[in-house]
């Protein structure tokens, strides 16, 4: 999955606009997310492992907020021969176009339906696996429970939700410590102080992280029988919930 180097915030802006998943971001997204999200590669690989365990024959798999298709590709490699259909959705035309190119580079018997649309408008049905990989944090807090309710209703019994999110911690010292470690991670990956500062300003109004307790309480209240964090590095985590 090719990507140009992310230097979108390398020059100073008089006014930093809100972050958008536009063509400029899509062109550097693979580099951006791997240099910004600790453990991203491990998460993508394990999504494939979990798909191998939970994808049921003759069911659907949903990748909600698929971006360039990394999770979809990881899943598709691991579910051959099960007559599954993957439905990959993103509201960015630029992401969908590049996702289609990435998927076309690999031959597979597992079909992928690519949809450019709002994940809040998609009816989940006959799903054995649903993936929200750093997607829900960009929805308004009011929309999150409705989305998860739709997912819960569309999952088959024993179906799996994979939810990866940046976390917020109410304990101020924990929050500041993990935030500092994340900033050090970005510095170690070549981002300058200017890039870090401007990217943070750009995301400030569009990404609203929840606490781990908020995630768990919301998921359990909808009826999911089991919940666990399977991965965490600093203030980034990936969770699983079983219907």
UniProtKB/Swiss-Prot annotation:
Enzyme Commission number, as recorded: 2.1.3.-
Catalytic activity: prephenate + S-adenosyl-L-methionine = carboxy-S-adenosyl-L-methionine + 3-phenylpyruvate + H2O
GO biological process: tRNA wobble uridine modification
Enzyme class at the top of the EC tree: transferase
One of the record's GO molecular function terms: S-adenosyl-L-methionine binding
Binding positions (S-adenosyl-L-methionine): 40, 65-67, 90-91, 118-119, 133, 200
CDD domains assigned: AdoMet_MTases
SUPFAM superfamilies assigned to the protein according to its UniProt record, in alphabetical order: S-adenosyl-L-methionine-dependent methyltransferases (SSF53335)
Pfam families: Methyltransf_25
Keywords: S-adenosyl-L-methionine, Transferase
Domain of life, per lineage: Bacteria
Subunit architecture: Homodimer.
NCBIfam families noted in UniProt: carboxy-S-adenosyl-L-methionine synthase CmoA (TIGR00740), PRK15451.1 (NF011995)
PANTHER family found in the cross-reference section: CARBOXY-S-ADENOSYL-L-METHIONINE SYNTHASE, TRANS-ACONITATE 2-METHYLTRANSFERASE-RELATED
Family: Belongs to the class I-like SAM-binding methyltransferase superfamily. Cx-SAM synthase family.
Known function: Catalyzes the conversion of S-adenosyl-L-methionine (SAM) to carboxy-S-adenosyl-L-methionine (Cx-SAM).
Protein name per UniProt: Carboxy-S-adenosyl-L-methionine synthase
Organism (species): Shewanella halifaxensis (strain HAW-EB4)
């Amino acid at each position: 999955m090719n990507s140009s180097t992310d230097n979108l915030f390398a020059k100073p802006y008089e006014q930093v606009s809100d972050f958008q998943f536009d063509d400029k971001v899509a062109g550097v997204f693979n580099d951006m997310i791997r240099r910004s999200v600790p453990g991203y590669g491990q998460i993508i690989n394990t999504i494939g492992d979990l798909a191998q365990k939970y994808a049921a024959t003759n069911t659907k798999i949903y990748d909600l907020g698929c971006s360039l298709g990394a999770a979809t590709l990881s899943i598709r490699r691991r579910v051959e021969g099960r007559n599954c259909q993957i439905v990959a959705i993103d509201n960015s035309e630029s992401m969908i176009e590049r996702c289609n190119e990435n998927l076309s580079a690999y031959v597979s018997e597992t079909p992928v339906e690519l949809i450019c649309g709002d994940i809040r408008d998609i009816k989940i049905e006959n799903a054995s696996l649903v993936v929200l990989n750093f997607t829900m944090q960009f929805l308004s807090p009011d929309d999150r429970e409705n989305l998860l309710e739709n997912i819960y209703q569309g999952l088959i019994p024993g179906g799996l939700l994979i939810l990866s999110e940046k976390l917020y911690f109410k304990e101020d010292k924990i929050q500041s410590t993990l935030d500092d470690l994340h900033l050090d991670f970005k510095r170690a990956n070549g981002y300058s102080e200017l890039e870090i500062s401007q990217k943070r300003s750009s995301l400030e109004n569009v990404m609203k992280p929840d606490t781990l307790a908020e995630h768990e309480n919301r998921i359990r209240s909808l009826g999911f029988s089991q919940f666990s964090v399977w991965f965490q590095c600093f203030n980034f985590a990936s969770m699983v919930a079983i219907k």
